[in-house]
């Protein structure tokens, strides 16, 4: 590449970057987080939210999509932590395939036809039971939804499908979502495997992704 073409490319790239910075995002917002880079540890989204004393969700009715993997680096579960905050009201817990606590999911109490979490008193909804979407009546009670779950890094997991359905429902009800991210356990650097055909799209292949999606 000649020097002239290289300079033109750099200028174009710079203008594209400036335009992207000015436009930012239409539906998303950037939240300032504490600088923890001086610690030689991994901090998940839940750890960061705890560092901010959960200010983003205080004085709000929240729904949480999680399972047993939603723990801090000190192995404290999100439901145990938030259950101690009087100014955070957990209205609903959305559980994925296998439930909140895996196959041994007997901790929720059955009161009438409703399942209740004994720690927070929140109503529990399994997104794989009957309807793949949460009920409209509970969505109308929520101010924000928090998602914290460790995915597997492969397409066959239904977690990403349930999250997508939750996003679709939240969009219909104009409810903001906070995603507490976690690292890909099989790393996000490698992509492997074929793409599914559209005619075979299912809940185990809701998105047209390779088996190992990165």
Q: What is each model feature region?
A:
Residues 151-163:
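Glycine/threonine-rich flexible loop motifs
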Residues 102-106, 178-201:
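Glycine-rich, charge-decorated loop segments at or immediately adjacent to ligand/cofactor-binding or catalytic sites
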Residues 110-142, 154:
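Glycine-rich oxoanion-binding loops at beta->alpha junctions
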Residues 89-99, 180:
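Short internal beta-strands
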Residues 41-88:
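N-terminal phosphate-binding or glycine-rich loops at protein starts, especially the Walker A/P-loop
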